[in-house]
């Protein structure tokens, strides 16, 4: 399992915790507003909005909240916020790289809060470009293994995924334990998602992410704990949408941290 997969597994676990705190809801609503603003409020003609809505529904965001976010972003309802996307770069313990994606209406606030969270938790801010060059934009689709077909339980296999998506541009399928993660070129993410739907396979999320091209091994539990504390501190900021890292943490170390 690649370092990205291990981090992806952890992010899925963290998302479940964030959802309970309401943290994830706010991030999902922001994604919907931005997608509607950039491509229009009709999900049928705006695949980015379609996927943002589907992801929110999977996390049980109420339909009325989703509808309001679409209207605000599409200019059909007042109260919309003019967000901008900003990327910050940092290093953590043992040289681990962090790429921080923000959606904010206040650039100065976002910069100050990210810098404070990084420096107070054992990290250092990096020069622009020094970290981003270690990542590449990829299409990432997540599929839960346990599904239903014809009202009966159906466990999705890697072969099912490959058969459905290989011709659509899937490049790599990673086993995350309870789900599969499919990587493709960023431009192929909609094609991969559509191919899954055509095969009757449900998906959890489909989006473009930054994937590490060079992993940094983190085999010591105490160092891994510091890395996670740093990531948590940054990811919990209101302006932060995503934190990407190239930390490659072995399963046994991950389990000890989870415990």
Swiss-Prot record:
Belongs to the TACO1 family. This is Probable transcriptional regulatory protein Noca_2383. Pfam families: TACO1_YebC_N, Transcrip_reg. Its main location: cytoplasm. It is found in: Cytoplasm. It comes from Nocardioides sp. (strain ATCC BAA-499 / JS614). The keyword Lipid biosynthesis does not apply. The lineage of its organism: Bacteria, Bacillati, Actinomycetota, Actinomycetes, Propionibacteriales. InterPro entries: Integrase-like_N, TACO1_YebC-like_2nd/3rd_dom, TACO1_YebC_N, Transcrip_reg_TACO1-like, Transcrip_reg_TACO1-like_dom3, YebC-like. It comes from the Bacteria.
